């Protein structure tokens, strides 16, 4: 289903196609669940009255080696969003680059620490170059599903728990 909707935030209220809505969301991290279970999970979410699913994206799962990206199998964010859409769920994507989520190194790839000039989670140009490359590849997967393109992705949260370290 393509939603062809207008989504707005006005003050503390959310509006879909001009009508005030409440977002009732649950978190499901696609990379922590088998792809075969996504549809069943979403059906159960709908049965509980939820209308939205929120998911982190773990950079260290998608780019295990510098410049080598994987969006297959349980890492297929596009299929995850497509399955949510099929179940009439809106989607909030939280791509990081840091996600926390009780996930190793907050989802940052291990290799990012190997450069002595690297400073993470700041405006360090080396760090920015790497995470911009990751976000570019990830957004290529997500872009077709943005609400502005008729898809179910209504919001994105970049970074997470900044200044909590």
Each model region followed by its residue ranges:
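N-terminal carbohydrate-binding accessory modules
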Residues: 1-52, 82, 86-90
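Active-site region of glycoside hydrolase catalytic domains
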Residues: 8-10, 81-82, 86-165
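Aromatic-residue detector
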Residues: 13, 21-22, 38, 56, ...
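The substrate-binding groove and active-site-proximal loops of carbohydrate-active enzymes
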Residues: 23-35, 59-76, 113-133, 159-165
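Aromatic-lined substrate-binding rim segments of carbohydrate-active enzymes
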Residues: 38-106, 110-112
